[in-house]
């Protein structure tokens, strides 16, 4: 597994520098008085948990890195344990819809609300923690929704949620097969372009690079 991590490097640091400061995703948007010249990079994983989750968590722990896991609804005690481990290790647990089925999720505001409530309640029941961050499947500007995405965005705001898209991808969601080193190279080639980067990766059984 290729893990870049969430880190803040000095403005003049080059790609490949050692992590200097670990930050959670919620600190990407800072109060004006806390803004610095450092680059900030948030590592995020979508679609989990999966059988790869324990290995991802082990690697993150080894390197003292915190990440955000935007999870879907998975059933069974094994999945419940993975949810709990994400929280126990100090990572941010975010929502990525229960079903991840675009045709159902984005059919109407009612459908979206039902899906949201189902996942929100499940995660709170399993972990004891209330989620406050959300990532839309396909992103907030996807073209597959039958409903104006602004309706969903407004609803999340009413629930006290913040949604996050991404501006850097590692390439693990494409048809092309990349090695772990190539995934890292893809990320490092893009993070140098931004002061604040949100890196999209996936925690899925079929993605084991």
Q: Where are these predicted regions, by residue range?
A:
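Terminal accessory/targeting
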Residues: 1-41, 58-67, 181, 192-209
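Catalytic domains of cell-wall/extracellular-matrix polysaccharide-remodeling enzymes
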Residues: 55, 77, 100-209
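Active-site beta->alpha N-cap acidic-glycine motif
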Residues: 18-136
């Amino acid at each position: 597994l290729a893990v870049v991590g969430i880190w803040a490097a000095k403005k003049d640091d080059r790609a490949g520098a050692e992590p200097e400061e670990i930050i959670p995703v919620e600190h990407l948007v800072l109060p004006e008085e806390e803004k610095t010249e450092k680059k900030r990079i948030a590592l995020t994983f979508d679609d989990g948990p999966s059988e790869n989750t324990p290995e991802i968590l082990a690697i993150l722990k080894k390197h003292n890195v915190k990440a955000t896991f935007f999870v879907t609804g998975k059933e069974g005690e094994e999945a419940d344990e993975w949810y709990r481990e994400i929280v126990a290790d100090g990572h941010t647990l975010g929502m990525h819809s229960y079903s991840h089925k675009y045709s159902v999720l984005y059919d109407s505001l009612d459908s979206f609300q039902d899906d949201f409530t189902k996942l929100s309640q499940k995660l709170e029941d399993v972990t004891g923690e209330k989620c406050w961050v959300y990532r839309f499947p396909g992103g907030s500007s996807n073209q597959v929704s039958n409903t104006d995405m602004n309706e969903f965005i407004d609803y999340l705001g009413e629930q006290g949620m913040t949604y996050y898209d991404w501006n850097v991808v590692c390439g693990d969601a494409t048809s092309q097969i990349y090695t772990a080193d190539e995934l890292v190279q893809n990320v490092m080639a893009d993070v140098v372009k931004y002061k604040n980067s949100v890196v999209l990766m996936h925690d899925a059984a079929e993605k084991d690079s």
